[in-house]
Amino acid sequence: MSASILEDVAVVPQKAVLVQGTIRDNILYGTDDILPDDELFCILNSLGLIKEDCGEHFLAFLDRDINPLGSGLSGGEIQRLCIARALARKKKIIVLDEPTASIGEELAIKIITYIRQHCPTVIITTHNPRILELADHFFDGMSKSCVIAGEGRDQ
């Protein structure tokens, strides 16, 4: 795979990777871009990490220190921070490995719908049939060769 293709890809692994620093540091880790707070707010709100009416608490949330283990955060919050990092990179392709395993189903659907609206190509590995319903195409690994084209819903 050429280096130029990899420059267009953001990956969210199944096992989340965090760095020592603030939540903002973790979201912007690996990017040279500085996202304005309003863009960060939109991403975090869409991922259910902050509420629309959080006001000044938003900046306190961004400045909150966390460690690489994500102490004080739930597994779902850690996973959503990693998704926020991928979205903040503004890549053409996002690859997500079981991105919603630690997230409730309704929020997971909302998150995948948001990702699809903001990224041209989304590749997801999942065992969740509700997430598969959102796909334009999916590959059934059990049959080992069957590519199934679906009708991705515009939500």
Regions of interest found by a model, annotated:
Residues S2-V9, Q20-G21:
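ABC ATPase nucleotide-binding domain
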Residues M1-A3, D33-I34, K144:
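Conserved post-Walker A/P-loop segment of ABC ATPase nucleotide-binding domains
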Residues R24-P68, I109-T113:
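ABC ATPase nucleotide-binding domain helical subdomain, centered on the C-loop/LSGGQ "ABC signature"
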Residues M1-A3, C42, H57, Q117-H118:
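Primarily ABC-family ATPase nucleotide-binding module
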Residues A10, K15, I23-N26, D65-G152:
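ABC-family ATPase nucleotide-binding domain "signature/switch" substructure
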Residues V17, D32-I34, E105:
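Alpha-helix boundary/capping and short turn/kink residues
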